[in-house]
């Protein structure tokens, strides 16, 4: 709960819970199976040494055809910059392309979220679009950058 309720860690997120009950409700809405079109599926990121939840990774299964999805990642402040997001994303992308046979994976990023931009670029995603003022977030209109990668481009 601590990293998900931290406003600084989640300043680019749409979900910043104020109470533990909100987390319980969010988890209860999570589908029980992965790869259901139109749903978000959340995975937790656990630090092996401490067995502590340090972040999460969301997968949005887009459309009815099942060939595309969107990824997003949140890491606690004290664990950022240590490679956890990169490792979790690589494992998840491998699974999505090689096990679930996805064709394309995207990421939607606020242009001010430099860490996420660097993460997606490090993973060899390409910048596909920059939409001006198309998301209403935290009381104001913000831009959105879309990154994408095809299965045929994934080399990890």
Where are these regions (language model features)?
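Conserved catalytic-core motifs of GNAT/GCN5-like acyltransferases
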Residues: 106-108, 126-144
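Conserved phosphate-binding and hydrolysis motifs of nucleotide-dependent enzymes
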Residues: 55, 113, 124
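Structural motif
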Residues: 7-8, 100, 123-124
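Conserved G/P- and acidic residue-centered "switch" motifs that form tight phosphate/ATP-binding loops
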Residues: 51, 83, 113, 139
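GNAT-family acyltransferases
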Residues: 1-78, 140-156
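Conserved acetyl-CoA-binding loop-helix of GNAT-fold acetyltransferases
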Residues: 75, 81-98, 114-122
């Amino acid at each position: 709960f601590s990293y998900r309720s931290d406003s600084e860690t989640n300043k680019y997120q749409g979900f910043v819970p104020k109470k533990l009950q909100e987390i319980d409700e969010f988890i209860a809405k999570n589908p029980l199976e992965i790869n259901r079109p139109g749903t978000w599926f959340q995975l937790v990121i656990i630090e092996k040494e401490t067995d502590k939840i340090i972040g999460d990774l969301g997968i949005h299964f887009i459309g009815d055809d099942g060939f595309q999805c969107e990824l997003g990642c949140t890491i606690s402040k004290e664990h950022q910059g240590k490679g956890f997001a990169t490792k979790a994303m690589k494992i998840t992308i491998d699974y999505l392309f090689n096990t679930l046979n996805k064709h394309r994976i995207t990421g939607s990023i606020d242009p001010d979220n430099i860490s996420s931009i660097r993460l997606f670029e490090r993973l060899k995603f390409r910048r596909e679009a920059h939409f001006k003022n198309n998301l209403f977030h935290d009381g104001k209109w913000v831009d959105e950058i879309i990154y994408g990668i095809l299965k045929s481009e994934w080399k990890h």
